[in-house]
Amino acid sequence: QYYLLNYYVDHEQWAEAVKVGRNAYKRYPDNYYIGLKYAMALCESGQYMASLNCLKKLQVLPYEGSYIGRDIYRRACLYQAMKEWEDGRYAKMLTMIEKTQEWPENLGVGKPDEELIDTRLEDYMAAIAYVEQGQSMQADKLFSQIASSNMSEAYFDSNNLLVVLALRNLGKVDMADSLVNEWKVKHVHNEIAQWCILVYNNEKKKATEILNKYEETEEIAPWNVGYRDYNFKFLSCQ
């Protein structure tokens, strides 16, 4: 069952992975490898709270590369927050965003130093929730934090989109426009950068075309093995 579960997960056949994972997890509840695969399948099939409940029961042994449990946990929290957003439940949205700041010890990885944690996506989503609730001071505080964050010179990160959107929300449109115009010159061949430019300019149809093209050809270049844009999938869902 473990090998079959792996097959379905590797091929992103999430409905089948959930079925096999459920049976395998019932049979081997102490096997956290199976538990993590099952939790991932639940998350990717839209069963976010079920995924979090599964993760809560696991006891993952710390080992090098054991970040997967924490990654699934964060994804499930963020996707559930997005669902609450779509349904207009902003208080619940904020609750789920707050949960992303937790690092459950049972998932096998400790919390890094604060300066190593990028929370711009979480902060932006929280700011949007505050805007919807009419709490402009709290929203502007978060927008300001995002707008003043550093953008990497080594690679283009989709979080850069959050920086210019935050600037625009703060009324600093000229500054945001200037940064986007720089991207047009510096990142002509970067599909994520081009997608961010189109989203910023509200060119939804072209942005979707770029996204589809990116998803068809997505791979990490050999010289970028140490970097993956983990937030792009979340941003492209919104």
Feature locations, PLM:
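Flexible helix-coil transition and linker loops at the boundaries of alpha-helical arrays
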Residues: 27, 60-71, 103-116, 148-154, ...
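Residue-level recognition of tetratricopeptide repeat
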Residues: 6, 40, 82, 128, ...
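Alpha-helical repeat scaffolds
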Residues: 15-25, 49-62, 89-102, 136-147, ...
